[in-house]
Amino acid sequence: DFTHNKSLSEEEKNQIEDLINLEISKNTKSIIETMSMQEAQAKGAIAFFGDKYGDEVRVLNLGEGFSIELCGGTHVKETGQIEFMKITSETGISSGVRRIEAVTGEGAKNLLSNLKNSYLEVGKQLHVETKIDDPSNDLGLFRSLNEILLSISKEVSTSVDQVQNKINQLIDENRSLNEELGTKERSNKASDLLKAT
């Protein structure tokens, strides 16, 4: 959770991912201490909004320049054990407070694998060649695949819209032709009646 007055742009999310993944690659040692809530607050530790803490708290520090957090869930000895991180969502949880949710390690690998498979399947369905240039650059690949799938999604959406517009146009033309045909049939019947009399 963090304070910010608006949602993050894709560029800002990418910058955050890059910063975090750089820190992960540095393999910084985790500093975990248990202390009283007062001591933790004196050190500048940040408590999460709405969370309840006991008399003793676990304090996590993952490197200089980053916030010190009260934490009950990080169990890595060094940041390198995280492997890499990918943001999955960013939402507002209250006025001026945003929340980033992300996957790391195996979760990030699974997400990347699913995205690769989706990319290859979309290419197959569209009969276009798909290739993955550098599978070792997982985060870069993830972003590239995500951008490609978003682009394809927009194109497919546009194509669907174009088809729907054409269908609507044909329905309107059919309605007009039926009305015109009905008018001609009525006119022909009237003409036939006049001839018969």
Give the location of each predicted region.
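Catalytic palm subdomain of template-directed nucleic-acid polymerases
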Residues: 1-16
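Acidic/histidine-rich
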Residues: 13-94, 162-197
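Terminal appendage regions of diverse proteins
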Residues: 10, 79-197
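Residues that cap or initiate secondary-structure elements
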Residues: 6-8, 65-66, 108
